[in-house]
Every structure is written in C-alpha cells, then in structure tokens.
C-alpha cells in the first residue's frame, strides 16, 4: 500500500472538521475539496523557436511530475505572426495523489523561495471558489537546476475547488496552508 500524502491526510484530519464547523455543513460531502490543479505556460516565442518548446515541456514535466500537453493556436492571427496549429504553450492537469503532492511542494517549498515574498493575493479568486496564481520564474521549484535554464519563464497555476463561493475557497486553501497576504 502506498504511503498517504501529507496534504491529503491534513485535509481529512484537520481541514474537513474545521470547515464543517465554520460553515455549518450538515453532510461531509458539502465540505469543499480540491478537484484539480492546472499548470499552464504560454510560450510566445515557441512559434519561431522549437527548442524553447522542448525545454519548456521538460521543465513543466519535472515540476509537475507528469508530461504536459502542447497547446496549439486555434486560428491564425497576422498581428502576432501566428498560424493555425502552431504550438503556443504547454499545460498539465494534476489530479488525486500528484495534485496533493504538488500543492504540498508549492506551499511548503516553492512559495517561500520567492524573493521578497509576503504572501499570495487573496483577490485572485474567480467568483466560484477557484484560485489562480501567476509565477514569474520557474527557479523557485527545487526540481529545476539554475544551470539548465535558458530563459526565465513564468507559469499560471489554477487550483480548482468544489467550493461554491470565494469565501469557502479561501477558507479551504488557508486551512491547507496557502500563505495569503493580510
């Protein structure tokens, strides 16, 4: 049997009872939980530079622990010198065990490594309890070696929850250890 994931264990033991008491849920299934985490990286230069795409795929795969999918342009846009079908980014969706492992690494290791870090914005919710976090550099993850990086690139991390409101989503992420700015 596999060892339990630390973040999942914390959710079941501490977070569920706390949220059930805070929001007066009568049923355990009403308590919000994280359904998936999506990591997305747009690559503007990928249409001209295929090497940038390969490097980005390798980096996101190392960070997420799972191979990303290449996203392609749906239609041509002359102003951006873009043709339909040209690679424009990479995305990966994490669920279950990998999702909890990634969230644990993000909260406890990666975010504290950001320079001048004072917490993440509490306003980045979408109105339905989902949270999106933009990172400016990939070097905050310990899986990425400084020497192997050709260019500093950011990424978007979306944490999708089953929460109905932003308040519930914020309470869930705060209970899991997300460091929100005061």
From Swiss-Prot:
Signal sequence coordinates: none
Regions crossing the membrane: none
Gene3D superfamilies on file: 3.30.1440.10
Pfam families according to UniProt: Ribosomal_L5, Ribosomal_L5_C
Coiled-coil stretches noted in the UniProt entry, renumbered to this chain: none
Molecular-function GO terms, alphabetical: RNA binding; rRNA binding; structural constituent of ribosome; tRNA binding
Gene Ontology CC annotations of this record: cytosolic large ribosomal subunit
Keyword Protein transport: no
GO biological process terms, semicolon-separated: translation
Protein purpose: This is one of the proteins that bind and probably mediate the attachment of the 5S RNA into the large ribosomal subunit, where it forms part of the central protuberance. In the 70S ribosome it contacts protein S13 of the 30S subunit (bridge B1b), connecting the 2 subunits; this bridge is implicated in subunit movement. Contacts the P site tRNA; the 5S rRNA and some of its associated proteins might help stabilize positioning of ribosome-bound tRNAs.
Family in the record: Belongs to the universal ribosomal protein uL5 family.
Protein name: Large ribosomal subunit protein uL5
Organism: Gloeobacter violaceus (strain ATCC 29082 / PCC 7421)
């Amino acid at each position: 049997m596999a060892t339990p994931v630390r973040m999942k264990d914390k959710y079941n033991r501490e977070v569920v009872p706390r949220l059930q008491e805070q929001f007066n849920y009568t049923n355990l299934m009403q308590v919000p939980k994280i359904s998936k985490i999506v990591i997305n990286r747009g690559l503007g230069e990928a249409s001209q530079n295929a090497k940038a795409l390969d490097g980005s795929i390798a980096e996101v795969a190392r960070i997420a622990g799972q191979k990303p999918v290449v996203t392609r342009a749906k239609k041509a846009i002359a102003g951006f010198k873009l043709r339909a079908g040209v690679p424009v980014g990479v995305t990966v969706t994490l669920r279950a065990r990998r999702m909890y492992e990634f969230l644990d690494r993000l909260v406890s290791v990666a975010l504290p490594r950001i320079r001048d870090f004072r917490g993440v914005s509490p306003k980045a919710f979408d109105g339905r309890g989902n949270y999106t976090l933009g990172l400016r550099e990939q070097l905050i993850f310990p899986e990425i070696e400084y020497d192997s990086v050709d260019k500093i690139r950011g990424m978007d991390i979306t944490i999708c929850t089953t929460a109905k409101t932003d308040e519930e989503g914020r309470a869930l992420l705060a209970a899991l250890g997300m460091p929100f700015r005061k």
